[in-house]
Amino acid sequence: MRYAAIAGFIALGWLLFFRTPGPGEVSAAARSAATAAGCGDLEQPVVPDPSRVHLAPGESFDYPDRPAAAGPHDAAPLPPDPHVYPIPVPETQGVHNLEHAYVIIYYRPAAEGGLDQETIDRLAAIARDEGRVIMAPYPALPDDRAFALLAWNTRWMCPATISADQAITMATSFIDAFRGTSVAPEAPHGLLGPLFQK
């Protein structure tokens, strides 16, 4: 009996501290919102066998497919605060955050034919309230896209016509499915990992 209890504690400890949860599925509601908004498919993987090489300080990288969801990246990630950046961020640093199981919300600003301000504000509220979520403008999104959700080697992009409700439905489901999971090579460990994501 004693050995069974010890084995149980060891198994529980492994689950709580070492096992990283796998990625989930985006909800049917999120997929329906994406279809109604005219979004592209959920891309996974974005690139086969992405590199995880750290670039030298100050070194840039020309990602062949943007916004980049994986690949060579800066040795330093973006700081977790602020969660919402008012200006574009260095893409090489953002990719490093993705490697650590963050989700990034990129958008084209309204002044550049992108998302309306209500949608931006509502997405920013989600980013501020969630750990391991960063939001920043990304003016270089493809011409027909104004909103992108990224996790490591995972991307979902939508046009500017997406409504605030559709964007919120997609973002919350995407965050739940991919943040802090083993889809990222350097995700936090253990089922308790998400408790420390803020």
Predicted regions and their residues:
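Intrinsic disorder/low-complexity signal
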Residues: 17-25
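Short linear sequence elements within intrinsically disordered, low-complexity coil regions
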Residues: 8, 19, 66-68, 112
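Surface-exposed, low-hydrophobicity interaction/linker segments
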Residues: 24-26, 30-93
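Mid-length scaffold segments of soluble, non-membrane domains
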Residues: 83-134
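Helix-rich interaction surfaces within compact, conserved domain-sized segments
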Residues: 25, 125-198
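Hydrophobic membrane-insertion alpha-helices, especially the h-region
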Residues: 2-18
